[in-house]
């Protein structure tokens, strides 16, 4: 469920405080390639020294682009702006279901402000809107919210219909036949993922403790309990599944992996704040928060499915949040918050094809302070468009949609 946009600052402060308890474990000497949009079109950039900084810290580095790679660089083609709204879902490459927020009554010292919410459908290209008659699958009679996750081969979908903030009914739908099977048992968490093409893994959660891990057969809806022997995981900080493996973070922020039938997990990465598995299951984007003597901030790194570091440091700042893969796994969006104005700050895109990082701040930020997304990123079906919502002093919220080419 979405949270109030004003909670971002509170969450950010809490995240920084929590990060002070973590310990550093990363190696030194990695490089970061950041593309300056103004000069990337010409193929020339400043080449800075890649030598590690004193004390073993990674040094953020801009490298020169070979001429033959210029035509493969990711660039921004166009931007769009939707006032007072957030994206609920993409109905197609050009249409989005949005929720518009209107302040009805200002808050006082004793009363919370009151808002009015309306749903509509907007064409990104024309800006024209129409009434939402239930498209997008976000709401169904008797439920507050409906979420759907498609299997890797597109044959099935796992559907969660939330009765309220805490309890959901679960279903598996055969997208070829249209048959829907209800899965036994309530759940209290949204966390899960496709283990393979026809098996869904659900971290059901519980009002006390971590709850069950359920292995669900998409073909017949059969549920099998998955055993995990890990005393350090009273709750799951993060949870996901891919390519026959189940990934999660324990109470000590260690990313671990195990396979159904093997109850003992293997530790992969320490100091993990969040992680996202790419849709093609090839990579894991990991946001770490480390501390060694003094607060060292957050770093974004890419690992393969086995937990081996792949390539360079992708991002660095005081806090990295909302990491999100495009549907085709070609791009990774993330937001960086940094107090130091000379560091990375704002929304960035990592292009997996070129290995470059593209800053987007110039396309949505007019000046200081740097605005940051208040809800998770939203990708179009093709991955060629990215939507994100910011606080706005005039319209409460504003959603930007960036077109890539």
Language model segments and positions:
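Sec-dependent N-terminal signal peptides of Gram-positive bacterial secreted proteins and lipoproteins
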Residues: 2-32
């Amino acid at each position: 469920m979405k949270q109030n946009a004003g909670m971002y600052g509170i969450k950010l402060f809490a995240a920084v405080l929590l990060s002070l308890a973590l310990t550093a474990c990363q190696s030194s000497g990695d490089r970061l390639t950041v593309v300056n949009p103004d000069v990337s079109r010409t193929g020339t950039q400043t080449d800075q020294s890649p030598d590690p900084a004193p004390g073993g810290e990674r040094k953020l580095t801009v490298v020169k682009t070979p001429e033959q790679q210029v035509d493969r660089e990711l660039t921004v083609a166009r931007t769009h702006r939707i006032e007072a709204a957030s994206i609920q879902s993409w109905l197609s490459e050009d249409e989005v279901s949005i929720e518009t927020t209107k302040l009805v009554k200002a808050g006082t010292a004793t009363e919370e402000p009151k808002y009015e919410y309306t749903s509509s459908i907007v064409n990104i290209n024309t800006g024209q809107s129409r009434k939402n008659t239930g498209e997008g699958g976000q709401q169904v009679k008797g439920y507050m919210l409906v979420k759907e996750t498609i299997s890797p081969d597109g044959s099935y979908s796992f559907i969660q219909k939330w009765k309220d903030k805490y309890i959901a009914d679960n279903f598996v739908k055969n997208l070829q036949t249209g048959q829907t099977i209800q899965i036994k048992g309530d759940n209290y968490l949204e966390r899960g993922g496709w283990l393979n093409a026809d098996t869904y893994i659900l971290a059901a959660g519980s009002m006390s403790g971590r709850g069950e891990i359920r292995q669900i057969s998409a073909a017949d809806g059969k549920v099998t309990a998955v055993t995990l022997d890990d005393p350090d995981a009273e709750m799951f900080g993060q949870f996901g599944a891919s390519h026959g493996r189940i990934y999660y973070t324990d109470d000590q922020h260690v990313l671990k992996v195990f396979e159904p039938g093997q109850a003992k997990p293997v530790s992969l990465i320490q100091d993990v704040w969040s992680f996202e598995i790419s849709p093609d299951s090839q990579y894991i984007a990991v946001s770490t928060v480390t501390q060694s003597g003094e607060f060292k901030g957050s770093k974004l790194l890419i690992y393969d499915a086995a937990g081996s570091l792949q390539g360079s440091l992708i991002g660095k700042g005081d806090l990295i949040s909302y990491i999100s893969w495009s549907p085709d796994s070609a791009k990774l969006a993330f937001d960086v918050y940094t107090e130091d104005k000379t560091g990375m700050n704002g929304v960035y895109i990592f292009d997996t094809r070129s290995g470059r990082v593209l800053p987007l701040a110039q396309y949505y930020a007019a000046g200081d302070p740097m605005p940051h997304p208040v809800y998770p990123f939203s990708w179009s079906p093709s991955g060629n468009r990215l939507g994100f919502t910011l606080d706005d002093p005039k319209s409460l919220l504003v959603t930007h949609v960036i077109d890539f080419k």
